[in-house]
């Protein structure tokens, strides 16, 4: 029986373990939390949900609803557990955190081919097939060893994400480019517009992190949010110098390096609550009807330069026995982490059986996420699923009808992928 190691019993690690246990591998699952918890851990069960109890929408018209459906078709343990521990009947999958974690822990322990090793994993053995599925707050000792494996410049320790908005929601009669260079768009604010925007920004509510002193930690490492910058009004004004003489300040939008339909609001990394981001940033002229596809976040995180380090099978290019899963590859969100664990496990199994490693078609939600991660540049920030990542059908739009088309197409493609991996 072939031995596989999985480092981390979080969402991605447990999803990967479940798939490989079913395949008959002997799985060594390393998890240190029972002997040494990090600041956001409280229980000994696997898959502890620290930041939220929600797996977001179940509506198939949403990208994340479709992503969950794709995972169900692929027999996801985590989604099965979330359904079991669900505490509401609405279009949102909210779970009882304890029951959710208990279900996964107890289910995995029924496998005789699972060995749970409750200790810190320090030395990465390159001779043993391994999935590295560490979470956002990993032990310093393990990170030191990881840096030796991938070089420290390829590992980022903080997440400072600017909001990403849909191009079609930008009013091009107000926002403008210079010399027809659509890589950058500009939004001018006069003094009255600035004052209204500024007052809304400084009074907006921020996210309360479960990690104590997280903002202080970020600022200590020179990562400052837009709301923190706004504490000094004049410094804030100087930060957004006007391009036109008639403007008081100018805010810049930058086109995404992979998806032409997405723009980020430059230097707007933020810790504002999501509903507050929509309310405040829609006060920027030209963004009155903005659709935010990825909200800004700032938190402690560990993620690697996926495009540079990993191949199509999320396998380390420099050592074929090492695979990665979870937030460390640059996915953002519970459901996204689950799918990364499953894809890593599928491809590790295929690699060990001398089969071609494959990911789903780029117009499935799973495939679209991987297509983005494996193409984006080294300056990317973690991505969560959204419909802008799939190919357009007759011009990109977000009507209910188009979402339905995208969802049906994605589910059909995952069914085709399921047939491929089972042959």
UniProtKB/Swiss-Prot annotation:
Annotated keywords: Cytoplasm, FAD, Flavoprotein, Methyltransferase, NAD, NADP, Transferase, tRNA processing
GO cellular component: cytosol
Entry's Gene Ontology molecular function annotations: flavin adenine dinucleotide binding; tRNA (uracil(54)-C5)-methyltransferase activity, 5,10-methylenetetrahydrofolate-dependent
GO biological process: one example: tRNA wobble uridine modification
Cofactors named for this entry: FAD
Domain of life: Bacteria
Subcellular location: Cytoplasm
Record EC number: 2.1.1.74
Catalytic activity line of the entry: uridine(54) in tRNA + (6R)-5,10-methylene-5,6,7,8-tetrahydrofolate + NADH + H(+) = 5-methyluridine(54) in tRNA + (6S)-5,6,7,8-tetrahydrofolate + NAD(+); uridine(54) in tRNA + (6R)-5,10-methylene-5,6,7,8-tetrahydrofolate + NADPH + H(+) = 5-methyluridine(54) in tRNA + (6S)-5,6,7,8-tetrahydrofolate + NADP(+)
Binding site for FAD: 8-13
Family matches, as HAMAP family: TrmFO
Matching NCBIfam families: PRK05335.1
Function: Catalyzes the folate-dependent formation of 5-methyl-uridine at position 54 (M-5-U54) in all tRNAs.
Family, per entry: Belongs to the MnmG family. TrmFO subfamily.
Protein name: Methylenetetrahydrofolate--tRNA-(uracil-5-)-methyltransferase TrmFO 2
Gene: trmFO2
